[in-house]
């Protein structure tokens, strides 16, 4: 049995689908694992409220952190506010298996502190254009898993998934990535399998 929960950081630009992915992961994993969530917003608890409204988990299992500044700082340079939220959840629910830490929307240079996250998932979306993987940055190149979301929008924005696939392979140098559409569940099974495999999770 794990003495400490697996902490999975979910990052990405504003509007890429981080909260939708967090919701989908909660719904997929909550019956198998002892699970909790920390969300980050600059001035509100909007993402936490969204998860509560959509019954992702019991409200007491979701903590919304108001960072009050650059969301990057709260997950990297000074992660204390998030670490305190993680500690609070551990005290509230002894024996947690998994804590999802969703960052506030940020730029392509955002990364999680190793003190806060054991695995990182970075979410980008097709509506930003097929050139996005080529722009690189730590999230695209170095995250443990890259999720390319909203693939259904590719025809609407003139984005080539084939080009995104080849560019992403080149930029990630063998690291895994998944194409997804959280509205329909495409890619979710692969993301769940990645978390379980890389996080060494064993369902009760």
Curated annotation (Swiss-Prot):
Pfam families for the chain: cobW (PF02492)
Binding site for GTP: 12-19
CDD domains registered for this protein in UniProt: UreG (cd05540)
Keyword Nucleotide-binding: yes
Domain of life: Bacteria
GO biological process terms held by the UniProt record: urea catabolic process
Cellular-component GO terms for this entry: cytoplasm
Signal peptide: none
Localization per record: Cytoplasm
Entry keyword set: Chaperone, Cytoplasm, GTP-binding, Nickel insertion, Nucleotide-binding
Family according to the record: Belongs to the SIMIBI class G3E GTPase family. UreG subfamily.
Subunit structure: Homodimer. UreD, UreF and UreG form a complex that acts as a GTP-hydrolysis-dependent molecular chaperone, activating the urease apoprotein by helping to assemble the nickel containing metallocenter of UreC. The UreE protein probably delivers the nickel.
NCBIfam families: ureG
Protein name: Urease accessory protein UreG
Gene: ureG
């Amino acid at each position: 049995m794990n003495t400490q929960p697996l902490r999975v950081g979910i990052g990405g630009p504003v509007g890429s689908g981080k909260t939708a992915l967090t919701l989908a992961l909660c719904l997929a994993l909550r019956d198998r694992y002892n699970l909790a969530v920390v969300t980050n917003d600059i001035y509100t608890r909007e993402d936490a409220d969204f998860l509560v409204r959509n019954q992702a988990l019991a409200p007491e299992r979701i903590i919304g952190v108001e960072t009050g500044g650059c969301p990057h700082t709260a997950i990297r340079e000074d992660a204390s506010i998030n670490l305190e939220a993680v500690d609070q959840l551990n005290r509230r629910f002894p024996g947690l298996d998994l804590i999802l830490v969703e960052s506030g929307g940020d730029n392509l240079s955002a990364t999680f502190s190793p003190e806060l996250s054991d695995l990182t998932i970075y979410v980008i979306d097709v509506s930003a254009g097929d050139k996005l993987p080529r722009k690189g940055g730590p999230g695209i190149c170095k995250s443990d898993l890259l999720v390319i979301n909203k693939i259904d929008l590719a025809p609407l924005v003139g984005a080539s998934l084939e080009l995104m696939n080849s560019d992403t392979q080149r930029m990630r140098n063998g690291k895994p990535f998944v194409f997804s559409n959280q509205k329909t569940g495409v890619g979710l099974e692969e993301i769940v399998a990645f978390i379980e495999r890389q996080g060494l999770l064993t369902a009760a």
